[in-house]
Amino acid sequence: MNLNQTLQEKYPHLEVSVLKLSEVKKNIDFRIDDSFWTMKLIYNNKLNYKKIGECLLKSQYGISINMNEGGDGIPIYRMNDIDNMLCNFEVKKYALIDKNELQTFRLNYGDVLFNRTNSYEFVGRTGIFYNNRENFVFASYLVRLVCNKEILLPEYLTVFLNTHIGKKEIRRRARPSINQTNVNPEELKEIKIPIFPMEFQLEIQNLVKDSHKALEESKELYKKAEETLYLELGLDPKNPLQSLLDSKTNNPTKSLNISIHTLKESFLKTGRLDSEYYQSKYEDIEKMIRSYKDGFCNLKDLVNDISSGFAFSSDDYQDVGELVLIRINNIKNATLDLSNVIYLKNEAYNLSPKDKIKKGDILISMSGSIGLSCVVRDDISAMVNQRILKFSIKNFNSDVLVLLLNSFICKMQFERIGTGGVQTNLSSIDMQNILIPKIDSTTQEKIAKYIQESFNLRKKSK
């Protein structure tokens, strides 16, 4: 019996690993931290393993460059643009790069992107890029992996790195620092992956491609829902905000963003003196909603059973359990993402019963990435964390309302009422006063049908 076995029998409640210095020196980064060695995996002797690095033709860091949200330059992938093992086609950031940089960092169909820097929870997020129609590049906290397809298909590598085993291998190599965690790509290459017959890898490839196809069809249907909404409001679906602003001036390209108000019309009425609040674009949106043919209402006129979350203590957190804690980072654009959640002790429910989630509830983020909204589509046992507005609604379709809340029509109202410095915050009272156009029931049904079909395909893709 070796020393490790002796210690484990004597102290079964401890994670212990005893190593020779010579064994530690074999590690490419000379790892001596306990988490690396105590999380070591057991391999199946019946399988053929290779190091990931032995199966790659190339690995490459992304480009470090300034980015913008104005659409100037080439779309650039960041850490949050990877979702459910796929690289999203719609990205928020762009970068001005020259031809040589584009040639160096342009993504190719079938490239695998690995997120080397993120929170401990999300580091190692991996997705495959399926686009050969447009130019995309990738940022420096991502790494491009190009597989030798005679040995390892990119779809299989992507799936493996997203499994429990793959994530454990990644996290044991993760190096925590202030507010983020990093994984050295050279250590990633040291991970051993079972090399299955190509026939099996091709089956995985087909499943991933079918998933991607269903997801793209889902996005097209959701886009149809958005187009139907904007057309109903008399806006151009291709650029709804610009079409609204252009309709308010005879010389749209040279219009100045100027708004003049008396003290009575401004501070004494709203309590706000900051110039940003009185930008003409916000007033144009408000006028458009107020003039909608079927009328308008305030959000509070549609709301039932409202709450704004509870500040649960980290002492109540658990890695596994039955009671899920919904945090702001779980709210995506119209989607509740439960892939990375933490749990609460069951008795935490008693701390704030009003913050228990029900199927059909709508959630809106109130801090940071403000105004993100989704519908709770399933029966789940969950509580909402602080700074999340939760409510049920009446006399309006929940999917259509969430579409409105995530559109520029409501996003810019949230932007206008936001307060704070480094992190923007929303008041639940101010949020309930935003304006909502009262879309007629026939149009709501049409929009809701597109959305339901979209989410059915999204569910199929998973």
Language model segments and positions:
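A structural connector/turn signal
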Residues: E101-L102, I178, L351-S352, D378, ...
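Glycine-rich, acidic and aromatic/proline-enriched surface loops and short helix-turn segments
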Residues: T163-G166, S407
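Sequence-specific dsDNA recognition surfaces
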Residues: Y49-I65, N80-D111, C297-S314, N329-K359
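Elongated alpha-helical scaffolds
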Residues: F105-V112, V137-A139, L152, P185-E186, ...
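A short beta-sheet element
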Residues: R78, F105, Y109, L113-F160, ...
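A short glycine-rich beta-alpha junction/loop motif
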Residues: N135-V143, R175-E199, A382-L389, G420-T443
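Short coil/turn segments at secondary-structure boundaries
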Residues: I65-G73, R172-A174, P240-L245, F312-G321, ...
